[in-house]
Amino acid sequence: MTSKIFSPKISAVIESLRKLPTIGKKSSQRLALYLLDKSPETAIAIANSLLDATANIKKCVYCQALTEDDVCNICSNTNRDDTKLCIIESMLDMIAIEEAGIYRGKYFVLNGRISPLDGIGPSELKLDILQQIIADRKIDEVILAISPTVEGETTAHFISQMIAKDIKISRIGFGVPFGGELEYLDQQTLLHAFNTRTNI
C-alpha cells in the first residue's frame, strides 16, 4: 500500500511502477513524482512508446526474441552461422553475448526456465518450436547458455535429452557461478565461459 498522502491517481502510478523488476517502494515513489511533477512530457513520451510497442512488438517466429517483424534481425542475417544454435533464457542474455562479440550463430530464447512450482513447463518455453527448428535446420552444435540455477539445470537436462544424438551439445560453464545469472557476467567471464564450454 502507498502512503495516504498520495491521491488515488498518484498511488496508481506508484503501484504500477512497483510491478517492474528491481523497483521497490521508494524508487517507485521517486519515479512517479519525477514523471508527474518535473517531467510530464517524459511521462507522456514513455506512455506513448509503450502503447506503440505493445501494439506492434511480437516474438520472432524462429528464435522467440522480441521484434517488430515476423523474423528478427539476427535470424534474418545471412552472415550468421546457421549451423550453431545458442539456447538462452532471455533477451538480456542475448544482449550480453552480442555485446561481448563472442558468438556469430543463431539463438533460441526460452523466455524462462522449467519451474513446476511456478507452473512453467516445456510447453510454456515453446520447446516444440525449438525441436522443429533443430529438425529443419542443418545444426551441428547446440550451445546451452543457461544459468546454473536449480531450474536452469533442470531445463538444460530436459533440452539435452530431447535433442538428436548426432548433434553436438555443449554447455558454457567455467566462470559462471552456481545460481549466477548470465546477463550479469562481465564480458571477459562470458568469453571464457564460451571458450571453455564442455560437451554433454
Curated annotation (Swiss-Prot):
GO terms for biological process: DNA recombination; DNA repair. GO terms for molecular function: DNA binding; zinc ion binding. Gene3D superfamilies: 3.40.1360.10, 6.10.250.240, RecR Domain 1. A zinc finger (C4-type) spans 60-75. Keywords: DNA damage, DNA recombination, DNA repair, Metal-binding, Zinc, Zinc-finger. Residues 83-177 form the Toprim domain. Belongs to the RecR family. May play a role in DNA repair. It seems to be involved in an RecBC-independent recombinational process of DNA repair. It may act with RecF and RecO. This is Recombination protein RecR. It comes from Francisella tularensis subsp. holarctica (strain LVS). The lineage of its organism: Bacteria, Pseudomonadati, Pseudomonadota, Gammaproteobacteria, Thiotrichales. The gene is recR.
